[in-house]
UniProtKB/Swiss-Prot annotation:
Protein name per Swiss-Prot or TrEMBL: Cytochrome c biogenesis protein CcsA
Coiled coil regions, renumbered to chain: none
Protein species of origin: Nostoc punctiforme (strain ATCC 29133 / PCC 73102)
GO molecular function, a single term: heme binding
Record bears the keyword Transmembrane: yes
Family: Belongs to the CcmF/CycK/Ccl1/NrfE/CcsA family.
Topology within the bilayer: Multi-pass membrane protein
Gene: ccsA
Major location category of this protein: membrane
């Protein structure tokens, strides 16, 4: 079997399947009453994942080394990682919205690798002496998996911002996302359903105003209690359209899964950076040389370290950590692709410069 022809067929097939899968997920979001679309989307992601795994395996057999030595191989490894993390996230959340945001990103990466890169960058070449090391598999694969996880987690955070329309949704629970989201507008909306007569304030403490309304019948007392969070912008609270319970439930799921996936990607990033330092010391005699790639890897680590610190230690929930994660999405792309293509250093692919 001609492995080069097989690889060419598989990379085009991966792109085509991801494109169709993206359309299926978007169609499922537009027509939620068609349940079979969700199953088709999951099947499409799984088939694309298998195609890319086969492509990377064929490249490994052909070249004789782990397929992460050039941009073409790393792009498909990244796409494979994104589809893998997607399948995990979708299985955990059981939400179609995961595919709505991850499928187009995976498709665009595959399209870039297949249709944009020059043919000489797609061909396998003998490894340079510095890359002939077991650290190639250890360092680069872990870094790429961390990028995949962090990107998917950040995409879900962006989806959270879209679902909540940027409103300051408050999570009543732990930072992991076990509580329920309730915006001020939603609390007002639910209070209108529970309270049949104008309530009178009974207490106020630490920025929370408690309102109670009681009605007695047959010796039973029904009490409706509404907690109103005092904000500096009451006009925004009053004018914000209340989110439906379905949106709130979806937002809770997205935030929870986003947090967990970023929590998976961050230790992978840490291990990858440490492995890279050890490899650099063996190859070049220095653990850290402030190469542009190393600098941006550190920036990426700091951004997501701040995200996890804010959630775990500072108790940030909802919109603020989602914005920080969305910023991390851009930083990951700069670290992975921007530095490699535009920068000059030991990690540059040298396409533009």
């Amino acid at each position: 079997m001609n492995l080069v022809v097989l690889q060419n067929w598989l990379d085009n097939a991966s792109f085509a399947i991801l494109f169709l899968t993206m359309l299926v997920y978007w169609g499922g979001a537009a027509f939620p009453n068609l349940p079979y679309l969700a199953a088709l989307g999951t099947a499409g992601m799984a088939i694309a994942n298998l195609c890319m795994a086969t492509l990377l395996g064929a490249r490994w057999i052909e070249a004789g080394y782990f397929p992460l030595s050039n941009l073409y191989e790393s792009l498909f490894f990244l796409t494979w990682g994104i589809t893998t993390v997607h399948l995990i996230a979708e299985s955990s959340s059981r939400s179609r919205l995961v595919g709505v945001v991850t499928a187009p990103v995976a498709m665009l990466i595959a399209a870039f690798a297949t249709m944009t890169l020059p043919s000489q960058m797609q061909a396998s070449e003998p490894l340079v002496p510095a890359l002939k090391s077991n650290w190639l598999m250890m360092h680069v694969s872990v870094m790429m998996l961390s990028y995949s996880a962090l990107m998917v987690g950040a995409l879900l955070a962006i989806a959270f911002l879209i679902v909540t329309r940027g409103q300051n949704i408050q999570l009543q629970g732990s930072s992991v996302g076990t509580g329920g989201y309730r915006s001020n507008g939603y609390r007002l909306h639910k209070a209108a359903e529970l309270i049949s007569q104008p309530p009178a304030p009974s207490a106020e403490n630490n920025g929370f105003a408690r309102f109670e309304s009681s009605s007695n019948g047959n010796g039973n007392a029904n009490t409706a209690v509404l907690n109103l969070v005092t904000t500096s912008e009451p006009q925004t609270v009053a004018s914000a359209e209340p989110l439906s319970p379905q949106r709130l439930s979806l937002a809770e799921t997205l935030d929870n899964i986003s947090y967990r996936i970023i929590g998976l990607g961050f230790p992978l990033l840490t291990i990858g950076i440490i492995a890279g330092g050890v490899w650099a010391n063996e190859a070049w005699g220095s653990y850290w040389s402030w190469d542009p790639k190393e600098t941006w890897a550190l920036i990426t680590w700091l951004v997501f370290a701040a995200y996890l610190h804010a959630r775990i230690t500072r108790g940030w929930q909802g919109r603020r950590p989602a914005i920080l994660a969305a910023t991390g999405f851009v930083v990951v792309w700069i670290c992975y692709l921007g530095v490699n293509l535009l920068g000059k250093g030991l990690h540059s692919y040298g396409w533009f410069f």
